[in-house]
Amino acid sequence: MRGALILSLLPALLFAADLKIDHVTVAGSSLNPLQANLSAAGIPPVYGGAHTNGATEMALVSFPDGSYLELMALQANADPHLIDQQPWAKFLRGNGGPCAWAAREKDLAGEVKRLEAASIPVSAPVRSGRQRPDAVRLEWETSDVGTEPRGTFFPFLIRDLTERRLRAFPQAKPVNRDFRGIAKVVIAVRDLDAAIKRYRQAYGLPAPIKQVDPGFDAHLALLGGVPVVLAQPLSAESWLNERLDQFGEAPCAFVLGANRPGRYHAASQTRWFGIEISWFDSGKLGWRLGFEIPEW
């Protein structure tokens, strides 16, 4: 009986262990300041081109594990009506910084069915794309998970229709090798226990590990092997609570995995779930970005 139960849970547990970050998105009203601020922190991005939606353009920093950090902003003279149609319109107009994340899927249709079987709302795949500055055309399909705007609470799902390396590696190699990739997505939530319940339902996760970080001003929860930290404000006066009031439940910070942490200046440090994390100066960067220190 016990063996049968373990076998029945195995697919969900395997999925949770294999949940891979495709990319994370930072939003702003103009691309130049986003690029300049990240470059000043020592992580220069490369321009990736305009999206086919007629409203946004992007730059990116890709990493050796294939994940990348996307800077997304409004195209010059974009039609306000087209901007309104974007799922992250308020982040773009309000310089919201972290706004979304995506999970890489080889079998998008299969994952849609799995989530539906777990009673998680998920949309049918929709095609999209963009053109790189060198005229290379990129195409992909995505599905939204949950009822919130795309990729804010749950990751949205993405599957490439053209070669993924063309999207992730515009220079045919990682843009930055000082970091392994995107290690954690930190999601601001109003009710930590309710958010934990939804993630466990969607991905078959074990009970979380919790801690309090007064420096980050949040109750934190780490769920199994997925690259997610849920963060609930410690108080009504928290910066996190103000962010929730303005942007809703969504990513509030991203954490990179560092290969060469000594090359970068940390404005502050903390320790999450036994791992040391250094934070860039959010006042200078305009949003919160950290990196895990490897324990060699």
Regions found by a protein language model. Give the residues of each.
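Bacterial N-terminal signal peptides
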Residues: A4-L13
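Glyoxalase I/VOC metalloenzyme domain signal
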Residues: A17-I21, V26-P45, F63-W296
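Histidine-centered divalent-metal-coordination microenvironment in nucleic-acid enzymes
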Residues: L60
